[in-house]
């Protein structure tokens, strides 16, 4: 899988396609992230919302429970 960067510099001699692994290493640096990321928090919030939602009276097959 490759990532293509839009609006790449046309004078550039290297390919604008980079491997995700190299981008992850470049962005993470030597310090691992501490705590939850914003994606983690959003997923936790979504999971809590799903647990609070009432279940429908009909199952997926359309039969009453």
From Swiss-Prot:
Keyword flag DNA-binding: no
Record keywords: Crown gall tumor, Plasmid
The UniProt record lists the keyword 4Fe-4S: no
Pfam families given in the database record: VirE1
InterPro entries found in the cross-reference section: VirE1
Note: The Ti plasmid contains at least six transcriptional units, designated vir loci, which are essential for efficient crown-gall tumorigenesis.
Known partners and oligomeric status: Forms heterodimers with virE2 that prevent virE2 anarchic homopolymerization and binding to DNA.
Task of the protein: Involved in DNA transformation; controls virE2 polymerization and prevents virE2 binding to DNA.
Protein name: Protein virE1
